[in-house]
Structures are given as C-alpha cells and as structure tokens.
Amino acid sequence: MRSIKVLLANDPAILREAVRAVIVRQPDMEVVGEILDPLGVLLAAKATQADVVVLGLRDAEEPGLVSHLLAECPQVTILGLAPHGDTALIVQMRPWRKEIVDPSAANLMRALRQAVREPGSAWHEPPSP
C-alpha cells in the first residue's frame, strides 16, 4: 500500500512542526511539502499530488480556498486545525465535513487514514473513557 502524501500549509510554525513530528512517525504517511503562502496551496497540492492538505482552521473554513482546492484536486482531503489545537475539521468533496471533537494525535491520524482510504465515509470517534 502506498504512503499517504501530506502537504503542510498551516500556521503558526509551532503547530506545523508538531503536525510534521506526528506524521513522520507514521509508517504509512509522508510529508511531501510545506508551504507558508495560502495562495500557493493549490499549486503545491497539484505539484506534490498530495492526498491530504493540512491548513489552519481559518483557511479551511474559507469557502473560496476550500472549494477551489477541492474543485482542482478532488482527491484531496483537507484537515483544518485550530492554532490552539483544540479543534480539528476534515473536509472532502461530495460535500463532506467532519469535526473532530478530541483532536489528539491518534484520533487525527485515524481520521485521516479513514478519510483518505474510504472517502466520504462516516468516521466515528472512539467512545470517551
């Protein structure tokens, strides 16, 4: 099975670095690029053939950016992260959107894997202890 290609395009830098640190530990994922300019996300997603684009939550909730990115790269799953790390959102075509209530590293990786491998599926978080 091929690796899930992840493009990091989120701010602040500390959040991007934290996400990168989690992804590089995943045997089935690879970081294929990092971009700081939201205007360059579309070009970078096309150039890297990313499966996942990680954006800041403000960018992921920007209808123009998301709709344009999904129109040009329909295979892409968008992961939007809040800068303070307590909210995450996964967006795909068809339209499909899932808020992750507990955005721990394990839950984010599980959600990304399912979103990429089963596009549009209803992902369920594990029950709280």
Placement of each model-derived feature along the sequence:
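A conserved mid-domain beta-alpha-beta active-site/ligand-binding segment of alpha/beta enzyme cores
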Residues: 129
